[in-house]
Amino acid sequence: MAEQLQEMKKACEKVYVDSTVVDYLLDIVEATRKHNNIALGVSPRGALAYLKAAKCYTALNGGDFVTPETVKFLAPFVLGHRIILEDLYSSKKKAADYVQEITHFVTAPTEDFAK
């Protein structure tokens, strides 16, 4: 079991992330810090965890490079618990809903992302 985990970790580390995809990921993170309904956005450590999650998700699904679609898909799952809402108790939306909303407004890159 430990060997399998080490192999999985190595596979995650080998996944390529184009600089435009990293910028896109960081734009989403930054948007959580500027959103009117979010009191506390994603931290730098949260951004690193988001990047690692994208790389591991890609590796586990047989990919060699992270796509903007993967970054967008994972955002609510990875970032939803990393933000604090302005009006935590009266908001009808969940934190993950706000993150999902942000991904619709942040422009994704469209280049070729393979290494």
PLM features: residue spans?
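Conserved AAA+ ATPase small/helical "lid" subdomain
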Residues: 1-50
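C-terminal engagement/docking regions of AAA+ P-loop ATPases
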Residues: 34-115
